Amino acid sequence: MSEESGSFGGWFSSWFNTSKDQESSSNLIQQQQPGTNYARNQQTLSSLRSQKQQAESSKEDTRNSPGKLVRTDTESYLDAPKTQQANNNRKVTRRLPLTNNNLVIDCPIPDRLLGALNCTERDEFSQLRYTAATCEPDDFELEGYTLRPKIYNRETELFIEDEILFTRTMHGVMKNIAHLCSLKKNSVWGPDGWKKVVVCIVADGRKVVNKRVLNVLASMGIYQAGIAKNIVDNKPVKAHIYEYTTQISIDSDMNIKGSDKGIVPVQTIFCLKEKNAKKINSHRWFFNAFGPILQPNVCILLDVGTRPGNSSIYQLWKVFHRNPLIGGACGEIRAMLGTACCQLINPLVAAQNFEYKMSNILDKPLESVFGYISVLPGAFSAYRYAALKNDVSGQGPLEKYFLGEDLHKDQHTGKKAGLFEANMYLAEDRILCFELVAKKDERWLLQYVDSAFGETDVPSQLPEFISQRRRWLNGSFFAGVYGLIHFSKIWNSGHGFSRTFLLLIEGIYNVISLIFSWFSVVIVLSFLCT
């Protein structure tokens, strides 16, 4: 899990934090029957529900203390052997056939989970597909890897990504997919609309991923403990990929929802990276590894803990479907205010709520008229995959976007990035938006969709607020300067005269706004000094 996704808000911050005191000294992987694994995962969910109820009626310090959970296979799966004897006991040599020199295993799901499903006639419902990827994301397709939607020759209309799918986000996504399947008169969607949607979960690091999140995923059939391999054919594994079409959803109250509650099947890819490599690397797996295989029409990005509206994903997709020139879109970002807007009592939350509303009412609609939105928020945004792809020479929006990861790698190798680049790539999503609109010989536009919204947590404490804004201010300022310096790229794009003129007007507006932002910081600093 990346550092950017370390805080979740609400009671999740209490019950989903790792506690070293709960680690068992035993490091052996116990062989369990599938039904027993599922039962223990169910017991864990029941424990989580009871702990949440106790937390809601207790004081703040009690709510933030770690809860006592039932030990599951997921926990022992991540434990490393500390003694040579334990290590020897764990080793069981099995020879498995490779598929195109790659390790691919189809694992049956637990019997009790299988018995709770309505549709079981296809392998995607009865078997979890595991792939051990030993290559970098950019070489995923070239090394012969593939994905289930490609095997089934399914057209992927929507490709949805988020780093670690907590129940609040996942349940919201599954309700959106159920809404797509309810559109019986739509030419694209309908009862089988779920076959055109793939949900991708990218966990940033096997050792740091939250084990209780794995318990939830295991209860949905998306994950199984004990099948991951570290080395395949003397090559270290870079990522563990689990594919399953789940028919079960778990809401934020740890209640299981099935087809009787309107939940439809959802094609899911769970990519568990071996090492923590930050957010941009997770996006590299999403765009460069899985994207070329699935060839999706629209990619939707969701931040950790963001809950989309019940029809917001459809509202975003509809913009791309109606206008083939739309390369990116975003919806309204709303601050979670709690029951009866009680969070507004906190001045910090109230100020951020006002800021978000002003941005959604004034800034983004105005920029949408010109066709260029300075930033599509990563918490809830969508891109047309064809617009993001690089050209035959390897240059394009994604190439510029992933330079931020290369700068991060240079820091580990001793090479220092320049001051401008280091600050600019604190807001890499702004770079992506500019490069998309200024793409050579293309005329992609960005649009704001007010009918789509996503609710997200905002910092409620001053330290985390300052940390967030320091990153935003530095990144937005230097990314704005980058856009002005490279504004001449607009002349090489495929935009017509009228659109280029509108973009020129917006460029002048951005210059004035940048100057105002610079002097506003100086005024604030001088005020604080006095």
From Swiss-Prot:
Pfam families: Chitin_synth_1, Chitin_synth_1N. Its main location: membrane. GO terms for molecular function: chitin synthase activity. It is found in: Cell membrane. Glycans are attached at residues 17, 118, 310, 474. It catalyses: [(1->4)-N-acetyl-beta-D-glucosaminyl](n) + UDP-N-acetyl-alpha-D-glucosamine = [(1->4)-N-acetyl-beta-D-glucosaminyl](n+1) + UDP + H(+). GO terms for biological process: cell wall organization; chitin biosynthetic process. Optimum temperature is 15 to 40 degrees Celsius. Residues 24-56 have a biased composition (Polar residues). One of its GO terms (cellular component) is plasma membrane. It is a multi-pass membrane protein. Its EC number is 2.4.1.16. Optimum pH is 5.0 to 8.0. Belongs to the chitin synthase family. Class II subfamily. This is Chitin synthase 1. It comes from Rhizopus delemar (strain RA 99-880 / ATCC MYA-4621 / FGSC 9543 / NRRL 43880) (Mucormycosis agent). The gene is CHS1.
